[in-house]
């Protein structure tokens, strides 16, 4: 019996793990990566590239290494709890090398289309059209498709929502374009939004004004006794968050995070409670 062929679109973090999972299940993975290397989001580029994720030079991972690593491949012991993005990229390279995944990846190959075959209702098969760097197009049939192309490739810039933006004489840019603070030296800068990237950039840029519509709960990467925050995500705590009344849970969590600094004194007190809303907290090195 021939192994079922599975297409994996993207050679980043998710793509690599999908290749590994396919091999574990006796499937035949074929990965298509449009760039010339693995890593996806975690590959730093001096200049942002269209249709690709982008990050800034100083970015540090907000998840501790014990929680960030794959269950079958621990992080190197000398890695810090919260690592620089370059260290995580190196970890992905070590992972790909250890499990011999690179031979399943077709680099500089773009997926043009993915369609169900005419007999999909009987076979469950997909028709995938790709184009390599030489412009050669190829159509292949697969029994399954993993889409691992990422979700941060297109910056969202709702500038039309800000009255007067058309007459603003300064420069407007998205965090997708931001690499380091040097172009903003000596300038007055407003950072709109207090997500993780907004918080990081506000710290880096000199003389910054941070603008946030609703405020945010600021969560430190380090919790009690200096342990990584995500080590508090135990089964017991998870159970408590499910069974405790929402008002009591919010009171306890907000009291805990206000011990680091008083959100109201710093003008960051959110208009929403900590739990039970769509807006997530902001992780920072406080």
Question: Can you describe what each PLM-predicted range is?
Answer:
Residues 66-75:
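Surface-exposed beta-strand-to-loop junctions
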Residues 232:
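Active-site-lining helix/loop region of Rossmann-like oxidoreductase modules
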Residues 3-61, 74-227, 235-286:
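Flavin (primarily FAD) cofactor-binding/catalytic cores of flavoenzymes
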């Amino acid at each position: 019996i021939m192994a079922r062929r599975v297409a994996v679109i993207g050679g980043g973090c998710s793509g690599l793990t999908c290749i590994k999972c396919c091999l574990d299940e006796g499937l035949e993975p074929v990965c298509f990566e449009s760039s010339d290397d693995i890593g996806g989001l975690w590959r730093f580029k001096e200049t942002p590239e269209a249709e690709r994720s982008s990050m800034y030079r100083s970015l540090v991972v907000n998840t501790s290494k014990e929680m960030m690593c794959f269950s079958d491949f621990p992080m190197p012991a000398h890695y810090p709890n919260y690592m620089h993005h370059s260290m995580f990229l190196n970890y992905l390279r070590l992972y790909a090398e250890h499990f011999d995944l690179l031979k399943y990846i077709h680099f500089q190959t773009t997926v043009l289309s993915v369609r169900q075959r005419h007999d999909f209702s009987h076979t469950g098969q997909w028709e995938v059209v790709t184009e390599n760097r030489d412009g050669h197009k190829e159509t292949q049939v697969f029994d399954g498709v993993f889409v691992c192309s990422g979700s941060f490739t297109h910056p969202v810039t709702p500038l039309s929502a800000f009255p007067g933006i058309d007459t603003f004489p300064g420069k407007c840019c998205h965090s997708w374009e931001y690499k380091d603070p040097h172009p903003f030296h000596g300038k007055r800068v407003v950072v709109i939004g207090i997500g993780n990237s907004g918080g990081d950039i506000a710290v880096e840029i000199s003389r910054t004004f941070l603008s946030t519509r609703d405020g945010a709960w600021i969560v430190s990467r380090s919790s009690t006794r200096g342990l990584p925050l995500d080590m508090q995500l135990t089964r017991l705590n998870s159970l408590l968050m499910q069974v405790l009344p929402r008002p009591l849970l919010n009171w306890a969590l907000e009291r805990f995070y206000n011990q680091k600094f008083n959100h109201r004194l710093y003008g960051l007190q959110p208009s929403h409670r900590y739990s039970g809303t769509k807006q997530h907290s902001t992780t920072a090195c406080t």
